[in-house]
């Protein structure tokens, strides 16, 4: 059996890990073991935060809709409920975009929501 020297492959593997860790601070960008640990953690954080980003954007959309609807004298939950009762199927992303870019269209949706409020909402 021929002897296998692994120097080339080992150096290539280490170089790839160090290249991935090139922007990190201190030992995490220079030492192989620290760089390997950090790149594994970084991949975990990336995976987690790609999923958290979806909820973050939904929260941002809700804040924008709430601010715009309160400017028209209506709370967010009453606005969404009024749209649901009216059968308007516009998602929060589109509502937030309307609130930012086309306030007249958003105001017309607020009027639709006000017209479709339950009569005993205060009781």
From Swiss-Prot:
Keywords: Ribonucleoprotein, Ribosomal protein, RNA-binding, rRNA-binding. Residues 1-23 are annotated as: Disordered. CDD domains: Ribosomal_L20. InterPro entries: Ribosomal_bL20, RIBOSOMAL_L20_CS, Ribosomal_protein_bL20_C. One of its GO terms (biological process) is ribosomal large subunit assembly. The keyword Ribonucleoprotein applies. Residues 1-15 have a biased composition (Basic residues). PROSITE patterns: RIBOSOMAL_L20. SUPFAM superfamilies: Ribosomal protein L20. One of its GO terms (molecular function) is structural constituent of ribosome. One of its GO terms (cellular component) is ribonucleoprotein complex. Belongs to the bacterial ribosomal protein bL20 family. NCBIfam families: rplT_bact. Binds directly to 23S ribosomal RNA and is necessary for the in vitro assembly process of the 50S ribosomal subunit. It is not involved in the protein synthesizing functions of that subunit. HAMAP family: Ribosomal_bL20. This is Large ribosomal subunit protein bL20. It comes from Cutibacterium acnes (strain DSM 16379 / KPA171202).
């Amino acid at each position: 059996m021929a002897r296998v020297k692994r120097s080339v492959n080992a150096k290539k593997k280490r170089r790839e890990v160090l290249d991935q860790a090139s922007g990190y601070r201190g030992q995490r960008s220079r030492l192989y073991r620290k760089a390997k640990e950090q790149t594994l953690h970084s991949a975990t954080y990336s995976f987690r935060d790609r999923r958290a980003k979806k909820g973050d954007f939904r929260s941002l959309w809700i804040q924008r809709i709430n601010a715009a609807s309160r400017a028209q004298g209506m709370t967010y939950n009453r606005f969404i409920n009024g749209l649901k009762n009216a059968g308007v199927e516009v998602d929060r992303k589109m509502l937030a975009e309307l609130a930012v870019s086309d306030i007249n269209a958003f105001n017309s949706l607020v009027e639709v929501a006000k017209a479709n409020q339950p009569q005993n909402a205060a009781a």
